[in-house]
């Protein structure tokens, strides 16, 4: 099954390498991995999307919790607040049509010239997949796509933010 896992970690060099190394050693497949600073200085949130059977997901959480810079790990419910970002570059021969598709996906043109147009779209994984399909008619030259960033819904905390005491 597909799971979104959030890890609240100390923001220090090598944390992502340790997390990805753990997945490599255990032969878990990461579908997407994003990370960045949080509102608390010195801490980051890593969001992982994995496709594993239930025992594998439980094992992932247990192994992540053992890593020293990891403070809290949890699987988000099946419907977290989640978004991805895509930047794509297409042929610029039909800029008005490219803009119409961009608008349809609530996107933004970032760069336009006589040869190419570069646009940005944010949204759910499904929306991003649909946008890619829509832009194929303009010969997609390049794509840069983030992984999923996610938080728990409502007032529920995504992660406990107290420091680990060892």
Label every model-predicted segment.
Residues 1-44, 49-166:
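Long, contiguous binding/interaction regions
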């Amino acid at each position: 099954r597909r799971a979104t896992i959030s890890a609240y970690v100390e923001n220090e060099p090598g944390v992502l390498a340790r997390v990805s190394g753990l997945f490599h050693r255990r032969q878990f497949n990461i579908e997407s991995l994003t990370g960045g600073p949080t509102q608390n200085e010195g801490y980051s949130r890593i969001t992982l999307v994995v496709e594993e059977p239930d025992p594998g997901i439980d094992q992932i959480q247990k192994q992540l919790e053992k890593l020293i810079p990891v403070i809290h790990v949890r699987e988000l419910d099946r419907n977290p607040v989640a978004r991805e970002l895509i930047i794509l570059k297409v042929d610029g021969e039909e800029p008005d049509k490219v803009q119409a598709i961009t608008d349809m996906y609530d996107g933004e043109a970032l760069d336009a010239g006589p040869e190419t147009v570069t646009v940005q779209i944010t949204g759910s994984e499904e929306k991003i997949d649909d946008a890619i399909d829509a832009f194929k008619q303009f010969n997609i030259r390049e794509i840069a796509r983030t992984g999923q960033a996610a938080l728990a819904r409502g007032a529920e905390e995504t992660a406990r933010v107290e420091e680990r005491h060892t």
